[in-house]
């Protein structure tokens, strides 16, 4: 989301969970990795200058115990110049030999 774009959600969606083991979702973090890379590139505002650019890529996976009712969650990433909101939904087929077909 560009820094000039305002992102708003309903109050029900603004729940923030900081703990790695969340009892409310009955889930726990299984894997977490953050990769960072830096490089010098031409500045967007002045191509005659060189700007420092840093990129961050995050990977996370979690396991949930049944019964769980997590449909989708929203994860927010903040920086000084941007806010990224990612909608994440569980992969019901990950540990299953038979495909998951939602009903209803």
Curated annotation (Swiss-Prot):
Coiled coil: none
Function: May be signaling molecules that resemble neuropeptides. Ligand for alpha-neurexins.
Keyword Secreted recorded: yes
IV (linker domain) as annotated region, ranges: 10-18
UniProt family annotation: Belongs to the neurexophilin family.
Highest taxon above the source species: Eukaryota
Source taxonomy: Eukaryota, Metazoa, Chordata, Craniata, Vertebrata
Keywords (A to Z) from UniProt: Secreted
GO cellular component term, pick one: extracellular region
Ranges where the record places region V (Cys-rich): 19-104
InterPro entries: Nxph (IPR010450), NXPH/NXPE (IPR026845)
The protein's name: Neurexophilin-1
Compartment(s) of residence: Secreted
Residue ranges of the region described as III: 1-9
Keyword Secreted tagged: yes
A Pfam family that the UniProt record links to this protein: Neurexophilin
Protein species of origin: Macaca mulatta
């Amino acid at each position: 989301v560009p820094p000039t774009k305002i992102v708003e959600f309903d109050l029900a969606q603004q729940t923030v969970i900081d703990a790695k083991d969340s009892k409310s979702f009955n889930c726990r973090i299984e894997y977490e990795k953050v990769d960072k890379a830096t490089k010098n590139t031409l500045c967007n505002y002045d191509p005659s200058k060189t700007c420092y650019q840093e990129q961050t890529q995050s990977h996370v996976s979690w396991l949930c115990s049944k019964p769980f009712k997590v449909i989708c969650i929203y994860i927010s990433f903040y920086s000084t110049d941007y806010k990224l909101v990612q909608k994440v939904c569980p992969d019901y087929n990950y540990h299953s030999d038979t495909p998951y077909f939602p009903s209803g």
